[in-house]
Amino acid sequence: MTYALITGASKGIGKEIAFELAKRGNNILIIARDEKLLAAAADEIKLKYSVDCQFLALDLADPNSVDKTLVWCQENKFTVNILVNNAGYGLSGSFLNHDMLAYQNMMQVNMATPLSLILKFVPLLRQQPKSYILNIASSAAYQAVPGLAIYAASKSFVLSMSRGIRYELRDTSISVTAVNPGATDTNFASRADIKSEKAIRAAEKLNMNAETVAKMAVDGMYAGKAEVVTGVINKIGAILTVILPKSILERGAGSLYGV
């Protein structure tokens, strides 16, 4: 029996990806910080889709969380054939507003933990006849974003990492896909403490439903795509990052986020 392992799956895009994968008959492993939300999601998945769903409450900012995840899977004989690196968050405003510890925690969750999970699980994924790594990046990965500068940089890392390891794993059973959502109806803005009314209003106009984003992500993963950009507006935005001068893009983002 195989499982899909999804991080940051207690709510938002991660939770919807767990539901989408369960809908397609996958057994599910979900990881996040909030044990109550995880338990509720696991119960709902088992009841709704008649698949197994187990959860582990962990803070993925803890460098030891990856080893704990691997031990949990090994002790319970959970065979993982899908790894979804979804957990992540942002810090908004001037980059000087936050200290190094705050950035280290964010970079651990957004960058180091996904890479560490990949390093730990690739040897196991290679044992499966077909397996997948799905990394959730962001439309912010395509450019510098003043006001979300370090977050955007962390998502550029995820995108570049995904494409690089995809190529290196091209002759294996593992397919790697990066997904770049734009504004999505989740708690990202409140967690990032975005205060710019202009940015909040823009996001509200462009917000995609998390369920729709999750379906696009899973469709892209199973189709073996290298990269998925969710929604027409975000696709246009990605094209503009290639066409327009970087200075114009950065000025626009800075104006949007009030820095």
Regions found by a protein language model. Name each.
Residues 10-12:
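Conserved glycine-rich cofactor-binding loop
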